[in-house]
Regions:
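Transmembrane alpha-helical segments of polytopic membrane transport and secretion proteins
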Residues: 1-29, 320-334
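Interhelical loop and adjacent transmembrane-helix boundary motif
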Residues: 256-310
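Membrane-interfacial helix termini and adjacent extracytoplasmic/periplasmic loops
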Residues: 45, 53-89, 145-189, 259-260, ...
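Transmembrane alpha-helix signature in integral membrane proteins
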Residues: 85-116, 241, 309
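Transmembrane-helix boundary motif in ABC transporter permease subunits
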Residues: 101-133, 154, 160, 317-329
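Periplasmic/extracellular loop-to-transmembrane helix junction in inner-membrane transport proteins
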Residues: 8-24, 44-102, 122, 288-299
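Transmembrane alpha-helices
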Residues: 135, 139, 195-206, 219-259
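Non-cytoplasmic
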Residues: 146, 154-156, 237-275, 283
């Protein structure tokens, strides 16, 4: 046996120790998967009564969703009869419009900010901005909600919504600054730091030789950024967009504070007024009705809302995976 080599007994002990660690880690991973599966199963089982009573009409329009939720909440928890009538379209529409608008705004701002950080910002400025961006990404959503109701909503109410506009729709809905515009702006501000951090990190990994080669061929700097840097970073851009969209879909506390809290289907045909109309996204609906979960019909309905959010997140993840697959044809790792 070579000098200093471990003895066979020591090697066997080391192998057994490694196997024990692997089994322990495998058991922990399996436990996590079982817990996640149990949580998902619980949500869908508790959501089933709401879906079974309403069918596919659950996802459609029909009546005032606030009145429907109020009718459920006013039932006695021990009542033998439950009212399950529910039409979630206005909540689904509120979720879609706030999420899509916020992600579009955040994507444009994030791309420009990431390009500035990696291509134009001096090193001292970059060393200051990068920690600030990470800090903004970690700010609790309730802080953004406070900024929305204390600063953004009053400003919109006083300076952007005229009295004539308020009176023109006053018989239908009250315009007070807690609306689609405020929710979209604050939500975009919330998800932008996440996207900037991910996209900037991807742009920073683009080989410098690729950019220098493009410039050497006579391509100007902006065209090099678009054709070389952004194209190479496409997987990260897709991943950042998916992650930010998932964050926007699941945001509850902030949106419950600034969106207006009404199940009102904001109508794009109303023109500019559309942006000043209140909305209520799905996640915010759960927060606003959390105290009534002990009431059977309301509790099952909120679980149904949670199930829709879970399915939406799963579909979003699959869409992100599918969007990145064509990039592999060009040798881009996704």
């Amino acid at each position: 046996m070579p000098a200093g080599a471990p003895s066979p007994a020591r090697r066997r002990a080391s192998v057994r120790a490694d196997q024990r660690v692997e089994r322990m880690l495998g058991a922990l991973a399996a436990t996590v998967l079982v817990l996640i599966a149990a949580m998902i199963a619980t949500v869908f089982v508790k959501a089933w009564p709401s879906f079974s009573h309403n069918g596919l009409a659950w996802f459609g329009p029909g009546g005032d969703v606030d009145e429907q939720l109020r009718a459920m909440a006013e039932q006695s928890p021990v009542s033998g009869h439950s009212i399950y009538y529910f039409r979630a379209w206005s909540l689904i529409w509120g979720t879609l419009v706030t999420t899509v608008l916020a992600v579009i705004i955040a994507l444009v701002v994030s791309l420009l900010a990431a390009i500035f950080l990696t291509e134009f910002a001096p090193a001292p400025m970059r060393r200051i901005l990068e920690p600030v961006i990470r800090l903004l990404a970690a700010v609790p959503s309730v802080v953004y909600g406070l900024i929305g109701i204390l600063a953004i909503a009053p400003y919109i109410n006083e300076h952007l919504i005229s009295n004539a506009r308020k009176h023109s729709v006053g018989y239908v809905v009250q315009l007070n600054g807690a609306d689609l515009a405020t929710a979209t702006v604050i939500l975009a501000v919330m998800i932008t730091p996440i996207m900037v951090a991910l996209i900037a990190a991807a742009l920073a990994t683009v080989p410098r030789s690729w950019r220098e080669g493009s410039v050497a061929l006579g391509v100007n700097r902006w065209r090099t950024i678009v054709r070389v840097s952004l194209r190479t970073a496409r997987p990260a851009i897709v991943a950042a967009t998916v992650l930010a969209t998932a964050r926007a879909l699941g945001e509850a506390i902030m949106l419950s504070m600034v969106s207006g809290g009404r199940g009102f289907g904001a109508n794009p045909l109303d023109g500019v007024t559309f942006f000043f109309e209140p909305v209520r996204p799905l996640a915010a609906t759960i927060v606003q009705n959390a105290e009534g979960l002990s009431i059977p019909a309301l509790g099952h309905t909120m679980y149904a809302v949670a199930a829709v959010l879970l399915v939406s997140a799963a579909m979003l993840s699959f869409a992100g995976w599918a969007a990145k697959q064509p990039l592999k044809r060009y040798g881009i790792r996704a």
